[in-house]
């Protein structure tokens, strides 16, 4: 019984505990919900407070709408944000987009202080708000003024059409801030643009907010500057914005980043633009993305606005109320320079970031029109780089031209000028490279004689210039040429008209680059050419007659050698001692083998303790392409006598030799497998030789052997094959073996070989002994095996 009572008692206790527990839970739930409600109200409060600072005194009235805004669906807030990002719209965005609340709130916080500061500075900004409202709509729609309604619908989807209206009011309150906040809101609102915006939100919050602050300071400056200056500044800003627009089209994120850069440049030079036309600054960052105030206007021609003439159009916009006119200037811009804009936009799109970076550096000249132009110029630099034929040269010219183009507000014109200069630069470099030879003229002595005969070491410019000309590209040549006296180019241009190309190895005009030789490895003209051209040219410099002289008594020394150590290739080396610019050519027989030229190197040799400048050309030809004993020629020709595909070797210094056989003459004797023949083979013969056979002490007559002659072939000299029949006799055991001697005598050499043929009888005896030994061994093994198998085994038991 006691056990039963205990069970009941425990059961009662359990039930009571359970009841108490459930009661507690209910209470907890209730408190939780109440807490949630309080949190909700707190959020609303925050929104209201944030909108108030942004609004500034006149905006205070719009704070209530802001509250409504907050209470309304978050999506609506997002739309509003597009219009005036600074407004509580940012917070609303946070509430609307639960995923990005933090980022939105951050942006709002930063933007709000900036907005408050900026608003007072820019009076015009207020009107901009109206434009901004349109922009907001655009931001939502992401590209059209008409989208206003659409934008509202989009933002309202969450549920707050009224909220959208309220937002408009708030926006009006924060025109200036709008530029900054707009980007943020856009991030929250737009979907397609949201990606852009989203990225922009993070970037905008930090970068964009900072921009707002900068804009404030910039705005002050703009206000101080005269309207004209502001217009100029605005022009720069607009250009930037325009560029941004293009970039924005490409990537919304870029737009956000651009906005940051834009404010920076704006702070210095475009600051006025930022404030005067928040639409401009905003348009820059927000127009594409969230369509800042200028979004509406920009929407009309967002890309065009980024257009090249943004400078011109914008100038008017800021001058007349940046607010209302903001839209108008946009249109004007569109009408004025849609084509140009388009052109610039394309190139700018990829280079937007670079352009803004440049603007940041240019910012020191904020109030001047030059600064504003600097931005476009930086942007433009990227544009022409795409179209310019020669990127390298254009870059050089653009660097020097940017300052000039900066003065002119027309971007297209600047591009034209830059290109023109580029082309002129190209010509200059061409002259430099092609007139290298002409520099020799300046090196001549007053009496008309050249300095080639000098035994003294070449002057410092000589060797490097020659080396550079040979081994570096054109740009290297032009660089090297700058070390030569400036009059070289003048002389080159002066005498360029006198020279005319001629067939048969005569030089063409240096201006046209006719120095090109048949083979790329050939040397190009050197400033130290020894010989002049055209014998038919009556008038030369210094009023002296120009005649192609025969090579002077001190002709360059040429050494030619052929190596035969390699089996597969014939290698030849030609060394020319000279201080002049020479081109080296090769011939085997009557055929040119320049295609096998391994190149020419420049070196210094010591002759009698004096350093001598020399050229070394190497030729490497497969033996299969070479017939031994053929004549090989190395020709060193003055570069000014080389033209077209032919070379007049009569005016060149040549060195010839005979290609030797690939190897040394050698003789070998071989015995046939059967031992019935002895063969003597001699190779690398220049001509058919005389052969003599000796067997033992007997010398065979000419009819005692046969011989075959194989003439010279590619890669192989003559071969002689001789054969002797071996007549066996019955040799007895112990008889001496026979020895064979083959002697081959050529015109310039004699070779021989000696071999001994073993005694055939002794060989048979050896075989017999070997066979006997093997047989006995096998028998022994068999016996052992038999014994092992037949041996009796012990019984197991």
Curated annotation (Swiss-Prot):
Virulence factor. It is found in: Virion membrane. This is Glycoprotein gp2. Residues 212-373, 395-430, 445-457 have a biased composition (Low complexity). Disulfide bonds: none annotated. Residues 495-505 have a biased composition (Basic residues). Keywords: Glycoprotein, Membrane, Signal, Transmembrane, Transmembrane helix, Virion, Virulence. GO terms for cellular component: membrane; virion membrane. The keyword Signal applies. It holds the Pfam family Herpes_gp2. Residues 24-188, 212-549 are annotated as: Disordered. Residues 1-25 form the signal peptide. Residues 374-394, 466-492 have a biased composition (Polar residues). It is a single-pass membrane protein.
């Amino acid at each position: 019984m006691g056990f039963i009572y205990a069970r009941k008692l425990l059961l009662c206790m359990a039930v009571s505990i359970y009841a108490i527990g459930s009661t507690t839970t209910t209470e907890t739930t209730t408190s939780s919900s109440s807490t949630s409600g309080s949190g909700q109200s707190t959020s609303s409060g925050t929104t209201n407070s944030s909108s108030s600072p942004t609004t500034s005194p006149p905006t205070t009235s719009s704070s209530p709408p802001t509250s409504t805004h907050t209470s309304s669906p978050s999506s609506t807030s997002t739309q509003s944000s597009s219009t005036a990002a600074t407004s509580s719209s940012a917070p609303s965005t946070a509430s609307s987009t639960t995923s990005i609340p933090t980022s939105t709130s951050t942006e709002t916080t930063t933007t709000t202080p900036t907005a408050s500061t900026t608003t007072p500075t820019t009076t015009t900004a207020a009107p901009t708000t109206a434009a901004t409202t349109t922009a907001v709509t655009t931001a939502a729609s992401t590209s059209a003024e008409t989208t206003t309604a659409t934008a509202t619908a989009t933002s309202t989807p969450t549920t707050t059409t009224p909220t959208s209206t309220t937002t408009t009011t708030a926006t009006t309150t924060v025109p200036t801030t709008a530029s900054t906040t707009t980007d943020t809101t856009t991030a929250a609102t737009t979907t397609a643009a949201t990606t852009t915006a989203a990225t922009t939100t993070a970037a905008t919050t930090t970068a964009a907010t900072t921009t707002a602050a900068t804009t404030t300071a910039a705005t002050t400056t703009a206000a101080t500057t005269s309207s004209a200056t502001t217009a100029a500044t605005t022009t720069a800003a607009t250009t930037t914005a325009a560029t941004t627009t293009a970039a924005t089209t490409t990537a919304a994120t870029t737009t956000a980043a651009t906005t940051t850069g834009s404010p920076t440049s704006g702070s210095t030079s475009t600051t006025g633009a930022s404030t005067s036309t928040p639409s401009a600054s905003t348009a820059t960052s927000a127009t594409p993305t969230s369509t800042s105030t200028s979004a509406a206007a920009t929407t009309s021609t967002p890309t065009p606005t980024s257009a090249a003439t943004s400078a011109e159009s914008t100038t008017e916009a800021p001058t007349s109320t940046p607010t209302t006119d903001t839209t108008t200037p946009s249109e004007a811009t569109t009408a004025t320079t849609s084509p140009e804009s388009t052109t610039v936009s394309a190139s700018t799109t990829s280079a937007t970031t670079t352009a803004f970076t440049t603007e940041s550096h240019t910012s020191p000249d904020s109030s001047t029109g030059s600064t504003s132009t600097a931005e476009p110029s930086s942007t433009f630099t990227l544009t022409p780089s795409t179209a310019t034929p020669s990127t390298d040269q254009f870059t050089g010219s653009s660097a020097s031209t940017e300052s000039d183009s900066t003065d002119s507000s027309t971007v297209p014109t600047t591009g034209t000028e830059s290109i023109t200069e580029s082309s002129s630069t190209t010509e200059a470099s061409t002259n430099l490279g092609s007139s290298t030879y002409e520099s020799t003229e300046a090196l001549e002595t007053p009496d008309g004689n050249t300095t080639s005969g000098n035994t003294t070491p070449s002057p410092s410019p000589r060797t490097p210039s020659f080396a550079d000309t040979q081994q570096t590209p054109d740009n290297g040549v032009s660089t090297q040429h700058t070390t030569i006296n400036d009059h070289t180019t003048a002389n080159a241009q002066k005498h360029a008209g006198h020279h005319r190309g001629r067939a048969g190895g005569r030089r063409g005009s240096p201006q046209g680059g006719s120095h090109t030789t048949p083979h790329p490895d050939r040397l190009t003209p050197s400033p130290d050419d020894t010989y002049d051209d055209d014998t038919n040219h009556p008038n030369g410099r210094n009023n002296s007659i120009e005649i192609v002289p025969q090579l002077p008594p001190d002709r360059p020394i040429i050494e030619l050698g052929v190596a035969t150590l390699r089996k597969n290739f014939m290698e030849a080396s030609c060394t020319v001692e000279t201080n002049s610019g020479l081109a080296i050519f090769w011939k085997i027989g009557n055929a040119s083998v320049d295609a096998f030229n391994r190149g020419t190197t420049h070196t210094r040799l010591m002759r009698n303790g004096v350093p001598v400048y020399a050229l070394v050309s190497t030729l490497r030809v497969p033996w299969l392409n070479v017939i031994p004993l053929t004549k090989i020629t190395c020709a060193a020709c003055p570069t000014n006598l080389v033209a077209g595909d032919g070379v007049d070797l009569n005016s060149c210094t040549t060195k010839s030799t005979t290609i030797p056989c690939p190897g040394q003459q050698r003789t070998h004797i071989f015995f046939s497998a059967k031992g019935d023949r002895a063969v003597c083979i001699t190779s690398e013969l220049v001509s058919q030789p005389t052969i003599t056979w000796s067997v033992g002490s007997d010398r065979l007559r000419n009819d005692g052997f046969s011989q075959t002659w194989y003439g010279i072939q590619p890669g192989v000299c003559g071969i002689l094959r001789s054969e002797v029949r071996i007549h066996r006799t019955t040799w007895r055991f112990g008889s001496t073996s026979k020895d064979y001697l083959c002697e081959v005598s050529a015109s310039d050499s004699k070779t021989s070989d000696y071999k001994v043929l073993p005694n055939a009888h002794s060989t048979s005896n050896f075989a017999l002994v070997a066979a006997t030994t093997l047989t006995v061994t096998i028998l022994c093994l068999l016996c052992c095996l038999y014994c092992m198998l037949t041996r009796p085994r012990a019984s197991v038991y």
